[in-house]
Design a protein with these regions (language model features):
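12-transmembrane solute porter fold
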Residues: 18-32, 39-41, 54, 264-469
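Helix-breaking motifs and short loop linkers at transmembrane-helix boundaries and internal kinks
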Residues: 49-51, 83, 104-110, 172, ...
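Extracellular/periplasmic helix-loop-helix junction of adjacent transmembrane segments
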Residues: 40-71, 108-110, 313-318
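Paired small-residue
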Residues: 94, 98-101, 109-118, 371-379
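Hydrophobic transmembrane-helix bundles of small-molecule transporters
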Residues: 169-281
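Cytoplasmic helix-loop-helix junction between adjacent transmembrane helices
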Residues: 116-151, 202
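Central cavity-lining transmembrane alpha-helices of secondary-active solute carriers
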Residues: 62-77, 126-130, 321-333
Length: 476
């Protein structure tokens, strides 16, 4: 990586071009985000109209997010070699095709095929951040613009889900997929018109063997985590087999990469703190927070025996909407802070505030009230969705070496996905264990305490992340 002392001067980029580029990249992120979040209130309508079971409709979501995770591992690297604009347009085109297939689905198999193809859009965020970084080399300016793009990734302040519910209620679930398709096509046009092509400094042939082995190892680990999430209903023999398969495939991947002339990821980079330090921090952060806001808090809010006894609609408005809205609004502010204090310092601040918020959450679990849940959601929206999540994405870009800028954002996306799955497995497991032994209130409390411990570990792990050499603003 270029050091901060001998880095070339940032190139001057026309403000109008950057504005047009931001609009195009934002459209691409919208196209992906709608596929991820717009269907949440539509699942029941889809189940009824297709006459399928809850388990089958849940599986269509699982295959989408699994596809997102797998494609995220290698498409950013393919963009390094073949051209990021070209690959991004291909991803968006595949997403549009997947939306058409899903909109025309007459059975669950056809719907699953469509959702898998939509999952090609999984690495849109790291791809757009790499494209932005190729154009905007001034670190302070990049930090601010990066935060604007990334802040959208948590959902468009709940408006996307509300729109999805309205469309499904008035026009059926197929209308939702047609809207997604339209946004994806618009994104293709904007990226084609306003983005410039960029590649890595070196563009050897793609290491497809390494990509396949890494993807297979990740898929085995991901499937094991999905099975663990079933808790008492999990098949532990299957989990053990999948974990062994994942480990064996990763060992083979390691040896293959050592032997390759132009590997997908050199093992030298994998051994460095910029790789494993960041990936460990991302994994621990996601594991500590994700299921809290997307599972534990909504469940506590709706619990009629020991919770706040809120309706499902009220829960969304009181917890998930303010969480997403604050994250969306505060993200650009976090970018400004990062441009002055550095990514690592801003990340650590976000982790500390998140842990403090969850300490408050322990008291909320003991005496649940709507306003306590609102405060918890707002603070976590600010500290995690609007700060820590954005800084982790940003570090994946600025810590990457110039000869292979796509590998770390891809692996980091994998860590985000694994962390999300582990969060449900670990925090729900703790909740169930404490609940069985000490009652429901202690179940919620135990899950919150487990989240705090994981965030403390994430903070300690963040101390191992090295200073981004290309970030002259980083002081600590």
């Amino acid at each position: 990586m270029t050091s901060a002392h001998n880095a070339p001067a940032p190139k001057q980029v026309d403000a109008k071009h950057v504005g047009a580029l931001m609009a195009a990249l934002m459209a691409a992120i919208f196209a992906f985000q709608l596929n991820a979040s717009m269907l949440s209130p539509v699942l029941t309508t889809m189940r009824v109209e297709l006459n399928i079971t809850d388990a089958e409709i849940g599986l269509t979501q699982t295959v989408f997010f699994t596809a997102c995770a797998v494609f995220s591992l290698f498409l950013p690297r393919l963009g390094d070699l073949k051209g990021r604009k070209k690959v991004l347009i291909g991803m968006l085109a595949c997403t549009a095709i997947g939306c058409v297939i899903s909109a025309c689905a007459t059975n669950v198999t056809m719907l699953m095929i469509g959702r898998v193809i939509q999952g090609v859009a999984g690495p849109v965020v790291p791809m757009t951040l790499l494209m932005l970084h190729a154009e905007v080399t001034d670190n302070a300016r990049y930090a601010r613009l990066m935060a604007i793009l990334t802040s959208v990734n948590g959902g468009i302040a709940g408006v996307d889900a509300l729109l999805g519910g309205w469309l499904a209620g008035n026009f059926g679930f197929r209308s939702v997929f047609w809207v997604m398709c339209g946004v994806a096509v618009l994104a293709v046009v904007l990226v084609w018109s306003f983005a410039r092509e960029s590649t890595a400094d070196e563009t050897p042939k793609m290491d497809w063997l390494g990509a396949i082995l890494l993807s297979a190892a990740f898929l085995a680990a991901y499937l094991a985590i999905n099975e663990i999430e079933k808790l008492a209903g999990a098949n532990w023999w299957l989990i053990a087999i999948e974990i062994v398969v994942a480990a064996v495939l990763f060992v083979i991947f390691w040896h293959v990469e050592n032997a390759q002339k132009n590997p997908m990821v050199t093992t030298t980079y994998l051994k460095e703190r910029r790789t494993w330090g960041l990936l460990l921090t991302t994994l621990l952060t996601m594991t500590g927070v994700f299921a809290v806001m997307n599972g534990i808090v909504p469940a506590l809010a709706q619990d009629t025996s020991v919770g706040a006894s809120m309706s499902a609609d009220t829960v969304s408005l009181a917890t998930l909407t303010p969480y997403a809205l604050v994250g969306l609004v505060f993200g650009p502010v976090a970018g400004v802070i990062a441009s002055k204090m550095g990514y690592r310092s801003t990340l650590r601040g976000g982790l500390i505030v998140s842990a403090i918020a969850m300490v408050f959450g322990v008291f909320v679990c003991q005496s649940p009230h709507i306003w306590g849940l609102v405060v918890l959601s707002v603070v976590l929206g600010l500290s995690y969705a609007g700060t820590a999540n954005i800084m982790l994405n940003g570090l994946g870009i600025v810590l990457s070496p110039e000869d292979n800028p796509g590998y770390l954002p891809g692996l980091n996306a994998g860590a985000f996905n694994l962390g999300a799955g582990l969060s449900y497995a670990i925090l729900y497991g703790v909740q169930q264990g404490f609940s069985d032994a000490h009652g429901a209130t202690m179940g919620y409390t135990g899950a919150m305490i487990a989240g705090i411990i994981l965030l403390v570990l994430a903070f300690l792990s963040s101390l191992l992340i090295p200073k981004p050499a290309q970030n002259a603003a980083e002081e600590h």
